[in-house]
Amino acid sequence: LPICTSYDVGLARAHPGASWRAGLVIVPVDAVGEVVDDFLADGPGRALAGSLAWEALRIEAGRPRWARDVDERAIPHELDWLRTAVHLTKGCYPGQETVARTLNLGKPPRRLAILQLDGLAGALPEPGAVVRLGERAAGVATSVVRHHDLGPMALALLRRGVPADAALAVEVAESTEGAENTESDGPAVLTRVDAAQEVLVSPEGRAQASPAERPGAGLRKSLLH
């Protein structure tokens, strides 16, 4: 087995974050100024940016963030984390059986995708907003940002069976405060923002390292005879 693998089987283009590298540095509060000065002096063209810019670049690269895009049911196959964060040849770690079983036998029930949101809509969806295919819930938006070049976009966990070319919509809660012809300020009204997918994890549910034939198929046939 290779050390790592990706869930891009059958996709026409490479993962947008395949060559993206980023990291977080934790420093004492009283050392922040010195660290920033060293960073700016370390090379030409460096500049400071805020957390929203960081989020925009992360979402553009299709990289999930712990505690934002990951819930208690998530497995690394759904997030394409087998590409960078899971070693396939090391054993004896919590969750190893689930990782191996899903890689060899199963298909991850959900898949991470980038959503390009309708730029004409005013409000952005909140993280946790429902993604719909027609009237059916197809998944949930996990991170949402307004990118400086690409406009509104999001990461979303979708059901694996959602077609890659499906027209989706994300629910947006808009406040009625200040709206005309309303007798009182009621609860927020749910509207929808159209969304187009950029597929990160193949709907086929197979990784590059997945076996061509399900393991044990021959044994099963011999038992039947």
Give the residues covered by each predicted segment:
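Acidic, low-complexity central loop/insert segments
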Residues: 1-64
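Short, structured patches in soluble enzyme cores that scaffold and shape functional sites
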Residues: 13-16, 23-31, 58-63, 90, ...
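Conserved active-site beta-strand-loop modules that form the wall/rim of enzyme catalytic pockets
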Residues: 23, 56, 68, 89-91, ...
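A short secondary-structure junction signal
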Residues: 23, 34-39, 70-72, 111, ...
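Conserved active-site and cofactor/substrate-binding residues in soluble primary-metabolism enzymes
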Residues: 30, 34, 54, 93, ...
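Short, acidic Gly/Pro/Ser/Thr-rich loop/turn segments
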Residues: 32-34, 66, 163, 204
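Active-site loop ensemble at the mouth of alpha/beta enzyme cores that anchors a bound cofactor
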Residues: 61-86, 90-94
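Glycine-rich, small/acidic residue-mixed loop/short-helix segments
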Residues: 74, 82-86, 96, 100-225
